[in-house]
A protein has these predicted regions:
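Hydrophobic/aromatic beta-strand patches that form the interior of the parallel beta-sheet core
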Residues: 1-3, 139-143, 221-223
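Switch/connector loops and helix/strand junctions flanking conserved nucleotide-binding motifs
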Residues: 11-12, 118-120, 148-154
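Conserved phosphate-donor/acceptor-positioning beta-strand/loop module used by diverse small-molecule
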Residues: 112-113, 130-180
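A solvent-exposed, charged loop/short amphipathic helix patch at secondary-structure junctions
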Residues: 63-76, 160-194
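Short beta-strand-centered segment that lines the nucleotide-binding/catalytic pocket of NTP-utilizing
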Residues: 1-13
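ATP-dependent small-molecule kinase phosphotransfer cores
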Residues: 13-123
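Charged helix-capping and loop-helix junction motifs
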Residues: 123-129
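NTP-dependent small-molecule kinase module
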Residues: 183-249
């Protein structure tokens, strides 16, 4: 059973926010406004495991409204909505483990977390509610990338920047630094350039947090995962990771 935390966020917890944002835009068009007001059309998100664009679009980017930017206050409000949704979605994992077993008879379960999980937990707190819940039900696995993988992620993001969730303190610092170093205001900031500029710094910010989270589980490398060709090979890799962890504890 594949439990996608991002999909759960975009459907169960932020689905109404996303749909309302679509409707807000549609209400600016006279024809669509009339149809909406008479319940003649239905507007909804078609988010899927493979297409999370409705969620990313709703999160948005701060900056110049003429370039699709949001006021920084509205941007931070949506960031906080995502934070609460992400925590709730991860705490739902236990219920979906039971559901997968009871409904479908699945003995195996994969919890596909969001990359921003490190932004909403405190790995140095032994009582962190989210990590405690996950550790009791799942084997947490960190797929550790190399510098080359990081560089490739940055290149991909530069080609197609997308909104993401970050810690409030980090975002405030980036927003202040960007405006001062680029001599722009909240209203003149280029939204895409800001998120591109922030992304590489965000990856560096996240690495030590992922490393600290790894103490709650095991670590495998991206190269090891790339060599997985079957369930049996995957199982063997997990055994190796557990053995490595036991040898260093």
């Amino acid at each position: 059973f594949h439990y996608s935390v991002d999909y759960r966020i975009g459907t169960r917890y932020m689905g109404e926010y996303i749909a309302d944002n679509f409707k807000r835009e549609a209400m600016r068009v006279p024809l669509l406004r009339e149809l909406l007001m008479t319940d003649s059309v239905y507007i909804a998100s078609n988010i899927t495991f493979d297409n999370l664009a409705p969620l990313s679009t709703y999160l948005g980017r701060p900056g110049d409204p003429a370039k699709g930017g949001l006021p920084f206050g509205e941007y931070m409000k949506r960031q906080d909505q995502h934070r609460q949704a992400e925590i709730a979605a991860m705490l739902d994992a236990k219920r979906f483990i039971d559901r997968a077993s009871d409904l479908y008879g699945y003995a195996n379960f994969v919890c596909d977390t969001s990359g921003s999980i490190c932004e909403v937990v405190d790995p140095d707190n032994p009582d962190d509610p989210v990590l405690t819940c996950l550790a009791e039900q799942l084997l947490m696995v960190w797929i550790k990338g190399s510098d080359a993988h990081t560089a490739e992620l940055v290149r991909r993001f530069d080609r197609a920047p997308k909104p993401m969730y970050y810690q409030p303190d980090f975002l405030h610092a980036m927003w202040q630094d960007y405006r001062s170093t680029h001599s722009v205001t909240d209203e003149t900031c280029d939204p895409d350039h800001f998120v591109r500029w922030t992304y590489a710094r965000a990856l560096a910010h996240r690495q030590p947090r992922y490393g600290a989270m790894a103490r709650w589980g095991v670590t495998v490398t991206a190269e090891e995962v790339a060599r997985v060709t079957s369930p049996a090979v995957f199982d063997d890799l997990m055994v190796q990771a557990i053995d490595r962890k036991a040898a260093t504890d």
